[in-house]
Amino acid sequence: MPTQLFTTTDDVVLTGRHWVRTDAPRAAVVLVHGFTASANDPAVCDVAEALHADGVDVVCYDARGHGTSEGHSTLGDLERHDVAAAVEAARERNDRVVLVGASMGAIAALRYAAHADGLAGIVSVSCPAQWRLPRNVQGVLAAGLTRTRVGRAVASRWMGVQVAPRWTNPEPPIGLVPRVQAPVAFLHGAADRFVPTSDAAELYEVAGEPRRLRIVSDMGHAFAPQSVPAIRDAVDWALAVEVRA
């Protein structure tokens, strides 16, 4: 699949990949990875290849501050501009675009969708409802990496992620979802140790119709082999229902 460069409206250059169908695609999917991931991660590629086999074009990219893209990660805030650039690229071949985002990527997708029209659907995977972290090892690690100077240095040196120096405290997903004017499916792993399944239920409760909630029994956090069948099914569902007026 060819490499592609996207430039966001705030002048950040992103490195992307485009899985292009040789026949006429039935839609396009923009795949938005989570924190510390990239477009080249095996789990991300597994999702992209499965969706591509289902008859859609797939656009994926390294979010700002990740992989070979420019900029600094803001954990789903300014990443809305990344999503916008990828959607624009996807629409060069197909107007029907579904966003599939995981964790930080789901936050970015919902933030973009709350102010956008014309999406065919959104699949939100492992998305938090509020800005709260679990009181376990995973929560302490996430807080340390993103909210302390030492943690940001560790993320840069050992994980290749450039984190913005300050947390912007943007509106949480629970406030964004009611403004989304597209079919939205919430997927969550029952074995997720970062974000509890109750967050998915909270987001589902405030979403408009059409909406869908699925808890996957053997799935953990974000993109993983166990999430692929559920994501494929959710994309099919989104494309089968009518977009709300």
Identify the residue ranges that each predicted region occupies:
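Conserved alpha/beta-hydrolase
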Residues: 48-70
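Hydrolase active-site cap/lid region
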Residues: 115-166, 176
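Short beta-strand/loop motif that positions the catalytic acidic residue
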Residues: 180, 186-188, 192
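Catalytic histidine-centered segment of alpha/beta-hydrolase-like enzymes
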Residues: 219-229
